[in-house]
């Protein structure tokens, strides 16, 4: 399991730990990842993803998982998130066609 957010693609970064005497040693800055279960309104089922806390705020800001995924670029999303996005788009399209008929 990689240390990468499935929604924002945030991953580990490399930097320096600087001591009082200004000695620099390499270290890794890891993202704050949490396992979260989102409820998709379009799919009507829970979706489990490993996301950063920054992504949690973004999902909340955009009105839930469906709104976030529909506005997100496919390049930033994990393959699992892209698959969920496609399912949401299909459900929304069928719901719109059913409403027109």
UniProtKB/Swiss-Prot annotation:
On whether Transferase is a keyword of this UniProt record, the answer is: no
Q: Which keywords, in A-to-Z order, does the entry hold?
A: Ribonucleoprotein, Ribosomal protein
InterPro entries recorded:
Ribosomal_bL28 (IPR026569), Ribosomal_bL28/bL31-like_sf (IPR034704), Ribosomal_bL28_bact-type (IPR001383), Ribosomal_bL28_sf (IPR037147)
Please list the GO biological process terms of this entry: translation
Q: Is Ribosomal protein among the key words of this record? A: yes
Q: Which GO terms describe its molecular function?
A: structural constituent of ribosome
SUPFAM superfamilies xrefs: L28p-like
Q: Which GO terms describe its cellular component?
A: cytosolic large ribosomal subunit
Cross-referenced Pfam families: Ribosomal_L28
NCBIfam families, A to Z: L28
Family to which this protein belongs: Belongs to the bacterial ribosomal protein bL28 family.
Q: What is this protein called?
A: Large ribosomal subunit protein bL28
Q: Which gene encodes it?
A: rpmB
């Amino acid at each position: 399991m990689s240390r990468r957010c499935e929604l924002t693609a945030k991953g580990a970064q490399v930097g320096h730990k600087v001591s009082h005497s200004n000695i620099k040693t390499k270290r890794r800055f890891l993202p704050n990842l949490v396992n979260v279960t989102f409820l998709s309104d379009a799919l009507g089922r829970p979706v489990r993803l490993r996301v950063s806390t920054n992504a949690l705020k973004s999902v909340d800001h955009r009105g839930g998982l469906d709104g976030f995924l529909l506005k997100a670029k496919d390049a930033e999303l994990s393959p699992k998130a892209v698959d969920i996005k496609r399912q949401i788009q299909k459900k929304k399209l069928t719901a719109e066609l059913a409403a027109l008929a």
